[in-house]
Amino acid sequence: MALKMDKSKELFEEAKKYLVGGVNSPVRYFKPYPFFVEKAKDCYLFDVDGNCYIDYCLAYGPMVLGHANDAVIKAVKEQLELGSAYGCPTEKEIILAKEVVKRVPCAEMVRFVNSGTEATMSAIRLARGVTGRKKIIKFDGAYHGAHDYVLVKSGSGALTHGHPNSPGIPEETTKNTILIPFNDEDAVKKAINENKDEIACIIVEPIMGNVGCILPKEGYLEFLREITEENDILLIFDEVITGFRLAKGGAQEYFGVVPDIATLGKILGGGFPIGAIVGRRELMEQFSPLGAIYQAGTFNGNPISITAGIATLKQLDDRFYKETARTAKILADTLRELADKHNIKAKVYNIASMFQIYFNDKEVVNYEIAKQSDTEKFMKYFWRLLEKGVFVPPSQFECCFTSIKHDDEVVDKTIKAMEDVFEGLE
């Protein structure tokens, strides 16, 4: 049964007159037009046409507690009464920083910024400034934000819409960015051997959540840690997605691999804009005002985002991680079983509360294989799920997430929808 989306269509036509492409981020667009949200609560989105969707996109990751969490709203309302921006330090910045340091293994000091993009840009600047080297290694398909250093062979919306290399970025900017396949130890060794004493850092998503959900091969992250230490190269974990999601201390706690620097975002802001660079004290103290490496921002440490972050992290206990991982595994297992039952070529990957399906008969271990997935079949799967009241990201090059509000009743409804969708998907 087709969705009623008349009001969304009308709003999209109006939006196109004033907003580029009718949206403010490419990942929000899908053909023929996206639904427009009126409100959200727990694990549900409600659109302007009165449709209700179980949400597995969760704003592309941040809403681990579900939407409109009572404790977060209460804390933010109280802070709003006290002011929304000061341009001065606050005690709450210290409180959240201490919580981050307590949880994240590599974090001895913190610098709050406003987005994951800002965090990775500043982390790379820090690595270059500390080492005095220019070159960086990034992995094909990894998305580390929308800045020029790393927007080459990118994932996320850049891959979804067919522009992994953005025009407008001079070759001079990216000539020091070395691109190699994920999960390939030999490629890392070759890149380092060919650029001896020139590489400042390797930046990596421990889970490639912007090309779907590509997992590191066993021992791969440990290998990156060892080879960077051997060659005096800094290792940066981009944990904008995995931070506080895989475990209290993120991927570095989950895998037991501690980088030199990490970037955080999404969950850290409890639904409000935020980012953070964290790392060893001797590295972090090279940022201004203590050091010469400049990093600043009008809204760094914004009290609204900081308050929401404190209220969010307080609720991420052991039960949270156990439950969100349990429900994600159930859904991933269901997708595998349905693909097998209906003889559909598909691979499903899951870790903690992250999962995704690729319509592909090969094991998806890197960007090149992910690109070979059947996007037409995925969009058929996406629309059929949407018609059944289940919203997943509109691209298999994004990741699905569970929140603490995805309880057994919600999961059962989702499984029923998935079963219906796979009938005739061949």
From Swiss-Prot:
Question: Which keywords does this chain's UniProt record carry?
Answer: Cytoplasm, Isomerase, Porphyrin biosynthesis, Pyridoxal phosphate
| A GO BP entry | protoporphyrinogen IX biosynthetic process
Q: What is its EC number?
A: 5.4.3.8
Intracellular or extracellular location(s):
Cytoplasm
- Is Cytoplasm one of the keywords UniProt gives this record? yes
State the needed cofactors, names only.
pyridoxal 5'-phosphate
Give the superkingdom in one word: Archaea
**One term of GO molecular function:** pyridoxal phosphate binding
Query: Known catalysed reaction(s)?
Result: (S)-4-amino-5-oxopentanoate = 5-aminolevulinate
Which GO cellular component terms, listed alphabetically, does the Swiss-Prot or TrEMBL entry include? cytoplasm
The principal location of this protein is cytoplasm
> Which sequence positions carry the modification called N6-(pyridoxal phosphate)lysine?
K266
Q: Where does this protein act, in terms of pathway?
A: Porphyrin-containing compound metabolism; protoporphyrin-IX biosynthesis; 5-aminolevulinate from L-glutamyl-tRNA(Glu): step 2/2
Q: Which NCBIfam families match?
A: hemL, PRK00062.1
Report the family membership.
Belongs to the class-III pyridoxal-phosphate-dependent aminotransferase family. HemL subfamily.
Name by which UniProt lists this protein: Glutamate-1-semialdehyde 2,1-aminomutase
Organism whose genome encodes this protein: Methanocaldococcus jannaschii (strain ATCC 43067 / DSM 2661 / JAL-1 / JCM 10045 / NBRC 100440)
